[in-house]
Amino acid sequence: MDISKEDILAMANNASKNTLMETLNIEICDVGVDFLMAKMPVNASVYQPDGVLHGGATVALAESVGSFAAHIFIDAQKYFVRGIEISANHLKSVSSGFVYARATFIHKGRTTQLFDIKITDEENNLVSVCKLTTITLPKD
């Protein structure tokens, strides 16, 4: 990476102001050569009616971290990233604490990117497994 880890985290979290990420309190919390990680608090604002994490909030977390991961590796002056397909398998319920999303590349193409995103709880138990496809398009 050409810029520091701290600069990437600051840029990502600053860019999420006034977005769904801010509404859901999603924070980009770690980055490495081949991954990006975010966390989201699990509380009443992301519950489904029976008091556990809503699958839609989980998918929003997954798409957020995957899209940011793609964004880090492009020239943002010339291109933008959009999610074009996402799938999720929810494996475990969570009712409190934080969930963590770790996005890693499966495919890193010029136009499309494919991510494996694992959502875990605070004890590192697997909560959901997601796949996200993003597309990089010119700003023209």
Where are these regions (language model features)?
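Terminal targeting signals and extreme-terminal segments of soluble enzymes
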Residues: M1-D140
